[in-house]
From Swiss-Prot:
This is Cell division protein FtsB. The gene is ftsB. It comes from Teredinibacter turnerae (strain ATCC 39867 / T7901). Residues 23-63 form a coiled coil. Residues 1-3 are cytoplasmic. GO terms for cellular component: cell division site; cell septum; plasma membrane. Residues 22-91 are periplasmic. Part of a complex composed of FtsB, FtsL and FtsQ. Belongs to the FtsB family. The chain crosses the membrane at residues 4-21. It comes from the Bacteria. PANTHER family: CELL DIVISION PROTEIN FTSB.
Length: 91
């Protein structure tokens, strides 16, 4: 009977140790849940960015207006007959 109690105490101690310390412990689970939440937030931010980029690609494929806007803003291009004015801020 004493052996049975001793063996049961050892098993309970092993299970308690695993519950509180090491891989699969409560602290480990909480850390992983936080990491999952952070990763899901990052994924949502990246999904929104991908939607914006896909819309921009679609606009560039279908219309000349988007291409013209991109050429003007990124490359400083102007149309024939236009005059370019650059306003420099003194600050």
């Amino acid at each position: 009977m004493k052996w049975l109690v001793a063996v049961l105490v050892v098993f309970v101690a092993m299970f308690q140790y695993r519950l509180w310390v090491g891989e699969g412990s409560i602290a480990d689970v909480v850390r992983l849940e936080r990491e999952i939440a952070r990763q899901e937030a990052d994924n949502e931010r990246l999904r929104e960015r991908n939607k914006q980029l896909a819309a921009e690609v679609d606009a560039l494929k279908t219309g000349d207006d988007a291409i013209e806007e991109r050429a003007r803003s990124d490359m400083g291009m102007i149309k024939e007959g236009e005059t370019f004015f650059m306003i420099i801020d003194d600050q």
